[in-house]
Amino acid sequence: IYSILGAIFIFIVICFGITAKDPFIIPIHTNDIHFTDKYDSSATLLIPAAYTLKDGTIEGEYRIAGKTYGTPTRKERISLHPTKGIVISGKWHSDYGFQQTVLIKNRKIRYHDDPHKRFRRALATVDGQLCILQSCIPMTLNQFSESIQKYCTNAVNLDMGDYGYGWYRKIKFSRIFKYNRDKQSNWIYIE
């Protein structure tokens, strides 16, 4: 138990040293990212993307290698574009993408009715580059959007739930208490 408390203490010190409301910003050094429904332990980047329903299916419409699956649950699609980063639009602009809660579009915050404070993660375009932004403390969606607005052109929420894990190179994204990979059914990845 002391090692867990020590890890939590270090995490809090690091977060509050940055300023609790400022997110961690992790640049992704390529726009060549994809969306997949296959777990790949050898991927350079692998983080949960769209919401996963209790039965393991992916919520909403999504695209893998140019084929569209699922049923739309929102008006907008999040295309993972090879030169533009993320494109938020009513139609697909690439062969890979998913539907998810839009946090920032064209530098404007989208407000949502979600009072729950949770750790948050987003895929965003920051200065023309794709980045992962993650909160240091639990926040509502609106608080998280407000904390990342100054950095982002566009940002979409990424599924964290109780199983928000993943990695980018040597950086590990994990919730402190749970690690239930079997519950996640889709990811953003780089080979």
Residue ranges and their predicted role:
Residues 2-191:
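Gly/Ser/Thr/Pro-rich low-complexity, intrinsically disordered segments
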